[in-house]
């Protein structure tokens, strides 16, 4: 049942098993991710469909690394370490690099996407919860 654009359904599950994108994202543009895979999806079927926020649960194996730099995006991103260790590297528009190490349960890094490119590498196997949401013009376009 929906009320306006708000889903009034209650849903519970397991984030690791609810991956809708094949990349760990389980809240966000589920319909868009299904379309990328050629699948059909009814966005009104779950409160996990959202244009306002994306949530990712991902278990990384030891030594897992992002291939290259993720270009700055118009969103704010928050990564929270649940277990293991991860190194995140950030590069500002003027070329300044900032390393961040997440080593203790609950360590986090948050950044405003338009300001920073980023990449990462796991030091050991780790589990990360990532939340991102649009800001500024990106939010106005939704």
Residue ranges, per PLM feature:
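A short, N-terminal "cap"/entry segment at the start of jelly-roll beta-barrel domains
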Residues: 1-62, 67-68, 100-101
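Double-stranded beta-helix
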Residues: 2-14, 117, 121-142
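Short, surface-exposed beta-edge/turn micro-motifs
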Residues: 55, 75-78, 106, 126
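Residue-level recognition of conserved beta-strand positions in structured domain cores
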Residues: 57, 90-92, 122, 132
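Histidine-centered metal-chelating micro-motifs
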Residues: 65-67, 87, 107-119, 137
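Glycine- and acidic-residue-biased ligand/ion/polar-headgroup-sensing regions
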Residues: 73-93
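Short hydrophobic/aromatic-rich beta-strand segments that constitute the beta-sheet cores
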Residues: 88-90, 111, 128-130
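Short acidic-glycine-tyrosine-enriched beta hairpin
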Residues: 92-115
